[in-house]
C-alpha cells in the first residue's frame, strides 16, 4: 500500500512524536551501555543484530509496536465505525498491558486488600514454595469477565489487582459515542463479584457472591471514590459476614462534569422502588395463579411446582430468571457438545449444617461457573440456556427421581412432536413415549429408560407451566404444552415483567462463557507421569517390580478418543482399529487386560485411589505373572470454563502360565 507524500510525512511525524514521548532513544542508550558492560567480552564488538536481540529481550520493541498500533488506531477511528462488540476475556495471573480505546469510557476498579476474614485468623504464614489454600476474586460486568491472581487465604488477604471495565451503551447510535455522566447513570447493571476458595487439593468452595453498585462514583469529586465492601456468606450463612474488601473506583478518562450525590441517590432509590413494585405485583399474581391451580385438584398441593427459588445469597427469585438463551460463540459447536460440557462440570449438593432435608440453593450462573460445580438445578438451568441459544424449544423440568428424590432435568420439544429428555448430570438423552394408563396393554409395556418418576412443572425464560394432568407420573404425561387442560400456564407478560433482561435491577446479568486455560497435552502428560509413579510405588510395597511399555501405552490413545467422541455425539467409532492394534501388540500365549475410567477432575492421587476400589483395576495394577508389562494412558479433553473430561486407561499384558 503506497501513501501520498503528505500522508507519509504526517505518519513519520506521528511516529517521531510517539518515540520522543516514550523516550525510546534514552532507553536504547541505557540498554546499549548495559549490554556492553555485562554481556560482551573485552575484545568483542557489538553488532546491530546483538542490539536488536537485547531490545527485544527487554520488551522495548514490543512496547514501541503497541504504542504505534495505538496511534494508527486513533487515526483510523476518525472514520465512522460500527459499534464495537463487548469483549470477554478471563484475566490471567500474569498482568498484561491493554490498549485503551480513547473513544470509550472506562471504570477502573482496584481491590486494595482485604480484612476481617476471621475464619482464617489462625492461618499460619505460608512458607516460600509451600502449597496453600488460596482466594480468587472473579468479576463480571456487561459481558466482560475478569479473574484476580490467587492470593493465600489469610485474615487480611493480600489482594492487589486492578480491573479495567468498559462502560458503554449497546443501543444503535450510542455504541460509538463516549458515555457521559447522565448516560452512565442509566446503566443499572451491577458488577458481580464472586469469591472462590481453592484448597491444597484443588477443590473449590463458593465463599461469597456480591453485587457492587458502582454508580456512586458518578457523584464523587474527580470521578474517584473509595469504599469498603462487606462480603456475606452463602446459603445457610448468607447473614454472616465473611470479610471486607477495600475497593477504589475511578472513571477514565476523568468526567468533565460530575453529578450531585443527591441526583445519583434519587436515581438509585427510584430504580429500587420500581423493582420492588414489579416484584410485589408478580408475587400477587403468583399467589392468585397458585390458588387457581389448587382449585383444579386439591392433590396438586403435593406436586413439585416451583415458582420461586433461593439463590446463593438467600434471595427468592422467580425460577424463570435463572434461564436465558446463552450463545457459546465458537467454544461449543453442537447441542450435544453443550450437554457434554455441562456434564463435565462437577456435581455437588449445596452444603447443609446438621441433618434434615436438602438445602435449596440455585446458584447464579457466574457463581456456578467460577466454582466449576453445582447441584442438579444449576446444571439443568445452564443446559437449558445453552439449548435455547441453539434455537431449540427447551424447558427445565422439576420433579422427582426414584424414591421421591427431588430432581431437575431438561426437556426439548421437536417440531415433529418428539419430546426428548436431557440429563444434565450425565449428558444422556431419552426419547419420551407416553403410555395411556386407561387402555389395557396388548403386550407388556417396556419400562422407560429414563430415571424420572414424577414431574410438577416446566419452565424457561418466557414460560411457566404447572402439570395439571390426573397423574404426575412422567411415563403417563402428555407434553402438549399448548393444551391448557394438561398444563396450566402463567401469563407470559407477568413473567416478562420480572424476568426479561433489564426488567428489574435485581436481575443478575448472564456472563459469557470463557475459553479453557488448560493445555490438554501438558496436563495429560503430567497426570500420566504421576500415575506411573503411584503404580510403581504401590507395586513396590507389594514386593513387585514394574516394567512400563511405552508402545502399549500409546496404543491405548485411540480407545480414549473414541470413548469421548461417543459421549459427545452418541456415535461409537474407531473401536475396530484399536482392537486390531492390540491383537498385533500382544504375542500368542499372552493375555491383555484393560480398564478405562472417566473423571471430571485432575487430581491424580484421588483418581488412583478411586481406581484401586475397582477389583478389576486392582487386578491389573497388582498383576503377577511372567513377562508382565504395564501401560497407562491419560487423555484430557478440555471444555469452556477450564472444565475437562479426564480419561484414564490402565492395561497390562503377561504370559499365561497354567
Swiss-Prot record:
Q: Name one GO biological process term.
A: regulation of centriole replication
Record's keyword terms, sorted: Cytoplasm, Cytoskeleton, Phosphoprotein
The record's GO CC annotations read: centriole; centrosome; cytoplasm
Subcellular location(s) per record = Cytoplasm, Cytoskeleton, Microtubule organizing center, Centrosome; Cytoplasm, Cytoskeleton, Microtubule organizing center, Centrosome, Centriole
Q: Which domain of life is it from?
A: Eukaryota
InterPro entries in alphabetical order: CEP76, CEP76-C2, CEP76_C, CEP76_N, CEPT76/DRC7_peptidase-like_dom, Papain-like_cys_pep_sf
- Where does the protein principally reside? cytoplasm
Q: Which residues cross the membrane?
A: none
Question: Cytoplasm: is it a keyword of this entry?
Answer: yes
Quaternary context? Interacts with CCP110 and CEP97.
What role does it play?
Centrosomal protein involved in regulation of centriole duplication. Required to limit centriole duplication to once per cell cycle by preventing centriole reduplication.
Its family remark reads: Belongs to the CEP76 family.
Q: Output this protein's name.
A: Centrosomal protein of 76 kDa
Q: Which organism is it from?
A: Pongo abelii
**Taxonomic lineage per UniProt?**
Eukaryota, Metazoa, Chordata, Craniata, Vertebrata
Q: Which gene encodes it?
A: CEP76
Amino acid at each position: 500500500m503506497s501513501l501520498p507524500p503528505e500522508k507519509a510525512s504526517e505518519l513519520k511525524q506521528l511516529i517521531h512524536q510517539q518515540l520522543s514521548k516514550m523516550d525510546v532513544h534514552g532507553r536504547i542508550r541505557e540498554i546499549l551501555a548495559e549490554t556492553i558492560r555485562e554481556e560482551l567480552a573485552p575484545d568483542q564488538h557489538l553488532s546491530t543484530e546483538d542490539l536488536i536481540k537485547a531490545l527485544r529481550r527487554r520488551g522495548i520493541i514490543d512496547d514501541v509496536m503497541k504504542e504505534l498500533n495505538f496511534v494508527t488506531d486513533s487515526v483510523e477511528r476518525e472514520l465512522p465505525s460500527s459499534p464495537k462488540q463487548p469483549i470477554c476475556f478471563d484475566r490471567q495471573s500474569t498482568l498484561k498491558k491493554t490498549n485503551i480505546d480513547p473513544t470509550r469510557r472506562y471504570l477502573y476498579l482496584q481491590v486494595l486488600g482485604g480484612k476481617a476474614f476471621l475464619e482464617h485468623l489462625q492461618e499460619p504464614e505460608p512458607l516460600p514454595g509451600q502449597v496453600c489454600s488460596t482466594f480468587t476474586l472473579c468479576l463480571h460486568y456487561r459481558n466482560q469477565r475478569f479473574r484476580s491472581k490467587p492470593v493465600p487465604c489469610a485474615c487480611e488477604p493480600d489482594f492487589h489487582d486492578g480491573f479495567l471495565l468498559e462502560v458503554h451503551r449497546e443501543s444503535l447510535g450510542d455504541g460509538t459515542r463516549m458515555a457521559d455522566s447522565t448516560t452512565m447513570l442509566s446503566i443499572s447493571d451491577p458488577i458481580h463479584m464472586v469469591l472462590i476458595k481453592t484448597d491444597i487439593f484443588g477443590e473449590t468452595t463458593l465463599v461469597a457472591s456480591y453485587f457492587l453498585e458502582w454508580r456512586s462514583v458518578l457523584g464523587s469529586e474527580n470521578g474517584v471514590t473509595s469504599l469498603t465492601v462487606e462480603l456475606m456468606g452463602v446459603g445457610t450463612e448468607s447473614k454472616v459476614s465473611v470479610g471486607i474488601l477495600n475497593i477504589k473506583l475511578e472513571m477514565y478518562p476523568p468526567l468533565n462534569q460530575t453529578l450531585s450525590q443527591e441526583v445519583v441517590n434519587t436515581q438509585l432509590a427510584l430504580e429500587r422502588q420500581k423493582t420492588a413494585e414489579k416484584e410485589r405485583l408478580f408475587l400477587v399474581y403468583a399467589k392468585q395463579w397458585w390458588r387457581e391451580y389448587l382449585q383444579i385438584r386439591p392433590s396438586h398441593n403435593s406436586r413439585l411446582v416451583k415458582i420461586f427459588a433461593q439463590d446463593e445469597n438467600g434471595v427468592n427469585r422467580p425460577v424463570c430468571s435463572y434461564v436465558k438463551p446463552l450463545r457459546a460463540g465458537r467454544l461449543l459447536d453442537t447441542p450435544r457438545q453443550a450437554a457434554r460440557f455441562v456434564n463435565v462440570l462437577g456435581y455437588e449438593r449445596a452444603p447443609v449444617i446438621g441433618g434434615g432435608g436438602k438445602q435449596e440453593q440455585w446458584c447464579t450462573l457466574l457463581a456456578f461457573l467460577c466454582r466449576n460445580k453445582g447441584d442438579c438445578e444449576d446444571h439443568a438451568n445452564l443446559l437449558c440456556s445453552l439449548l435455547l441459544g441453539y434455537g431449540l424449544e427447551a424447558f427445565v423440568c422439576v420433579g422427582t427421581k426414584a424414591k421421591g428424590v427431588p430432581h431437575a432435568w431438561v426437556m426439548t420439544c421437536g417440531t415433529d412432536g418428539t419430546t426428548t429428555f436431557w440429563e444434565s448430570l450425565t449428558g444422556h438423552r431419552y426419547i419420551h413415549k407416553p403410555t395411556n394408563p386407561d387402555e389395557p396393554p396388548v403386550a407388556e409395556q417396556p419400562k422407560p429408560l429414563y430415571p424420572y418418576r414424577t414431574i410438577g412443572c416446566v419452565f424457561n425464560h418466557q414460560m411457566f407451566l404447572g402439570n395439571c394432568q390426573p397423574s404426575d407420573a412422567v411415563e403417563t404425561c402428555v407434553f402438549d404444552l399448548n393444551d391448557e387442560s394438561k398444563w396450566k400456564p402463567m401469563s407470559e407478560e407477568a413473567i416478562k415483567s420480572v424476568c426479561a433482561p433489564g426488567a428489574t435491577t435485581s436481575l443478575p446479568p448472564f456472563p459469557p462463557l470463557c475459553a479453557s486455560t488448560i493445555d490438554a497435552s501438558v496436563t495429560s502428560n503430567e497426570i500420566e507421569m504421576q500415575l506411573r509413579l503411584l503404580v510403581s510405588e504401590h507395586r513396590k510395597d507389594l514386593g513387585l517390580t514394574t516394567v512400563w511399555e511405552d508402545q502399549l501405552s500409546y496404543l491405548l490413545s485411540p480407545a480414549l478418543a473414541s470413548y469421548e467422541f461417543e459421549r459427545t455425539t452418541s456415535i461409537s467409532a474407531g473401536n475396530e482399529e484399536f482392537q486390531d492394534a492390540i491383537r498385533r501388540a500382544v504375542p500368542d500365549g499372552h493375555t491383555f487386560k484393560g480398564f478405562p475410567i472417566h473423571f471430571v477432575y485432575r487430581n491424580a492421587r484421588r483418581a488412583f485411589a478411586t481406581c484401586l476400589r475397582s477389583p478389576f483395576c486392582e487386578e491389573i495394577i497388582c498383576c503377577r505373572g511372567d513377562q508382565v508389562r504395564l501401560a497407562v494412558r491419560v487423555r484430557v479433553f478440555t471444555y469452556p470454563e477450564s472444565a475437562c473430561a479426564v480419561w484414564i486407561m490402565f492395561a497390562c499384558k503377561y504370559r499365561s502360565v497354567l
